[in-house]
Amino acid sequence: MARGLKKHLKRLNAPKHWMLDKLGGAFAPKPSSGPHKSRECLPLVIIMRNRLKYALTYREVISILMQRQVMVDGKVRTDKTYPAGFMDVVSIPKTNENFRLLYDTKGRFRLHSLRDEESKFKLCKVRSVQFGQKGIPYLNTYDGRTIRYPDPLIKANDTIKLDLESNKIVDFIKFDVGNVVMVTGGRNRGRVGVIKNREKHKGSFETLHIQDSQGHEFATRLGNVFTLGKGTKPWVSLPKGKGIKLTIIEDARKRLAAQSATPA
């Protein structure tokens, strides 16, 4: 007989991109219900303890959060397992630090440091545009937001620029060929490039062909793509590497060059 949601998560079953030690204990933090899927998020306890190293233990994280020191998207969060996800802005006012959660080219979450002006907004992918009671239009975003009376030109798969203080749409990007995107799912997760071609398949998934700034081409599904900006210029700063995935040979050459450059 089922008794509701599981309240625990074994460490071996935790997502690989959390990068937890296999021998660090039997259990991992089970993400709370929230705006992101449990396998596509990073709980606050892992951000504070494992990534930023502001705490050594689980209990230290709880005491930091209970002092209301950590904000996600401009709101104080005290839940230790709150699921922060892609594009979320994590702020610590006491240290004047702001981070945006992005993917690296290996598909792992990366805390990318931000300037103050960039921490005031986030980009949100539009999941659907619908009409509610009395014909009021509203849109749903990838992080569970519902925004009423959007611009009539905004459609599904477009990206909106959201002001985190007022929760209002400042601008939007159409999902078009020629715009820069980041892949948020599949084997190419974390790669950044420009949409070159869009293939429609009746009764199946739409395929996008993307080319990065180095000329590498790859394909992915439509649902795995998040538009970052108009043309080739993204609206948010990107982590080191700019979302370009090197081949094994290119990576080896880069490491050899770095080793030879460092004095013995």
Swiss-Prot record:
<dbReference type="GO" id="GO:0022627">
    <property type="term" value="C:cytosolic small ribosomal subunit"/>
</dbReference>
<dbReference type="Pfam" id="PF08071">
    <property type="entry name" value="RS4NT"/>
</dbReference>
<dbReference type="InterPro" id="IPR032277">
    <property type="entry name" value="Ribosomal_eS4_C"/>
</dbReference>
<feature type="domain" description="S4 RNA-binding">
    <location>
        <begin position="42"/>
        <end position="104"/>
    </location>
</feature>
<dbReference type="InterPro" id="IPR013843">
    <property type="entry name" value="Ribosomal_eS4_N"/>
</dbReference>
<dbReference type="InterPro" id="IPR036986">
    <property type="entry name" value="S4_RNA-bd_sf"/>
</dbReference>
<dbReference type="GO" id="GO:0006412">
    <property type="term" value="P:translation"/>
</dbReference>
<keyword id="KW-0963">Cytoplasm</keyword>
<keyword id="KW-0699">rRNA-binding</keyword>
<dbReference type="GO" id="GO:0003723">
    <property type="term" value="F:RNA binding"/>
</dbReference>
<keyword id="KW-0689">Ribosomal protein</keyword>
<keyword id="KW-0687">Ribonucleoprotein</keyword>
<dbReference type="InterPro" id="IPR038237">
    <property type="entry name" value="Ribosomal_eS4_central_sf"/>
</dbReference>
<dbReference type="InterPro" id="IPR014722">
    <property type="entry name" value="Rib_uL2_dom2"/>
</dbReference>
<dbReference type="GO" id="GO:0003735">
    <property type="term" value="F:structural constituent of ribosome"/>
</dbReference>
<keyword id="KW-0694">RNA-binding</keyword>
<comment type="similarity">
    <text>Belongs to the eukaryotic ribosomal protein eS4 family.</text>
</comment>
<dbReference type="InterPro" id="IPR000876">
    <property type="entry name" value="Ribosomal_eS4"/>
</dbReference>
<dbReference type="InterPro" id="IPR041982">
    <property type="entry name" value="Ribosomal_eS4_KOW"/>
</dbReference>
<dbReference type="InterPro" id="IPR013845">
    <property type="entry name" value="Ribosomal_eS4_central_region"/>
</dbReference>
<dbReference type="Pfam" id="PF16121">
    <property type="entry name" value="40S_S4_C"/>
</dbReference>
<dbReference type="InterPro" id="IPR018199">
    <property type="entry name" value="Ribosomal_eS4_N_CS"/>
</dbReference>
<dbReference type="Pfam" id="PF00467">
    <property type="entry name" value="KOW"/>
</dbReference>
<protein>
    <recommendedName>
        <fullName>Small ribosomal subunit protein eS4</fullName>
    </recommendedName>
</protein>
<dbReference type="Pfam" id="PF00900">
    <property type="entry name" value="Ribosomal_S4e"/>
</dbReference>
<dbReference type="InterPro" id="IPR005824">
    <property type="entry name" value="KOW"/>
</dbReference>
<dbReference type="GO" id="GO:0019843">
    <property type="term" value="F:rRNA binding"/>
</dbReference>
